UniProtKB/Swiss-Prot annotation:
It comes from the Bacteria. This is NAD kinase. GO terms for biological process: NAD metabolic process; NADP biosynthetic process. It comes from Acidobacterium capsulatum (strain ATCC 51196 / DSM 11244 / BCRC 80197 / JCM 7670 / NBRC 15755 / NCIMB 13165 / 161). Its main location: cytoplasm. The gene is nadK. HAMAP family: NAD_kinase (MF_00361). InterPro entries: ATP-NAD_kinase_N (IPR017438), ATP-NAD_kinase_PpnK-typ_C (IPR017437), NAD/diacylglycerol_kinase_sf (IPR016064), NADK (IPR002504). It catalyses: NAD(+) + ATP = ADP + NADP(+) + H(+).
Amino acid sequence: MRRIAVIAKPQKDELASLLPELLAWLHGHGYDPVIDDIAATYTSEARIVPRADLPNENPELVIVLGGDGTLLAAARVFAKTGVPILSVNLGSLGFLTEVPLGDLYRHLEGWAQNCCNIEQRAMLHCELRRDGHQVCEYEALNDVVVSKGAIARMGDFRIDLDGALVAAFRADGVIISTPTGSTAYSLAANGPILAPNVDALIVTPVCPHLLTLRPLVVQGNADLKLKVAGIPDQTYLTVDGQEAIALCVGDEIHCRKSVYTVKLVRLGSTGFFDVLRAKLKWGER
């Protein structure tokens, strides 16, 4: 039987009625739905699997019910599987989760009839190295960020590109983002907007203490190294704004384009700039 995984956002009242309806539709169309532990707080009408274990169920599709944050979490869970994701917007902005709730079943019908398009989004591979040893590694859809905690003191950073020095500087932090992440935190820090199909990465210093240091766009196959030369206490590496690890002086963050991509299900021809105009009011006066 064809299997579909369902991932939900916590504390969304509308899911109490939506999830049973969705599961009934999936059962009625011959699918075997499995739900994550958060979706299980709204219904028990499907088999419950911890979110981290859902890839082991080998679903053909993942349905994400929530906002962009829920999609980012799902993308990391399924990063190495290549399973397409249908993301339904139950959040506020929904820049990535662009499918409105009213179009959910139209998209599912399209999926069942093999009429959907698959849009691939590049991911970022990040490794944290300490004293020459790898501490952890992540795949990110939006970005990885080095940022300070409560103490209002800047950090000292050094960026190398393919082994060559780019700049050494003081700043509140640094954002390294994918083209998808160019419309997230990097944009708020005056970074450029990149179309999702551009083969590039963005390095955006946060409040650098240099008038001449500006965001940098580098080739997609670049090997970026961010060295933490000096930082205040409670400085963290954050992945997609959701996973964090405390940093130490001398830590190195190595970033490059991931070998994995996120596959987003689309029905129709809504373009990136259509979404920019609709969601971010791009070009309006």
